[in-house]
UniProtKB/Swiss-Prot annotation:
One Gene Ontology cellular component annotation held by this UniProt entry: cytosol
Domain of life: Bacteria
Residue spans of the Lumazine-binding repeats: 1-97, 98-195
Binding partners and assembly: Homotrimer.
EC number: 2.5.1.9
Name this polypeptide is given: Riboflavin synthase
Organism lineage string: Bacteria, Pseudomonadati, Pseudomonadota, Gammaproteobacteria, Enterobacterales
Classification via InterPro entries: ATP_synth_asu-like_sf, Lumazine-bd, Lumazine-bd_dom, Riboflavin_synthase-like_b-brl
Record's catalysed reaction(s): 2 6,7-dimethyl-8-(1-D-ribityl)lumazine + H(+) = 5-amino-6-(D-ribitylamino)uracil + riboflavin
Amino acid sequence: MFTGIVNGIARVVSINKKKNFHTYTVNFSSILLKNLKIGDSVAHNGCCLTVKYINCPHVVFDIMKITIANTNLGVLNIGDYVNIERSLKYGDEMGGHIISGHIMNTGEISKISKLDKNYILWCKVKDLSLMKYIFYKGFIAIDGISLTINNIIKNEFCVSIIPETLSSTTIGFKKIGQLVNIEIDFYTQIIVDTTKRLIKKDISTLFK
């Protein structure tokens, strides 16, 4: 589990592309490397991956076929940077919201507005079925960053990015048309799906 508070960014130093998976290596800072061991879970742009090999400062991960298809990790190039968050441990501060690291789909950046210290990012959702989980002032994770939804228009939503997040993550480097990983709030999904199922069940009993 993760919190959506990014610990740092890491540079991709190599990518070995095979038929059904990629093996890629990233350069971790000393802070990100602290107590890291093989088998640990680490979020990359919000996507949970498992440490395969460590050769400080390089850390190696495998990216499976389904992850390549459903996240922006499949379009990474050498030299790109990714947001990194180590997994949540007992006693850690819960600064964002609970994130599983299971990316639902990607979204496309459709608009970026900058005015003084106000940075507003609009994102177009590719999978329209996710829109039923996206609510005004609800939680959402974009590339592993815990954010609050500020507006919704059809299949697009926007979030505001504070200066601290801009300086400590990759979000400030993003351009219009680029893909970002999206994970909707787990609890919102449960509430929406359960309510929908119960309403459907109640309606069906009326016609028995």
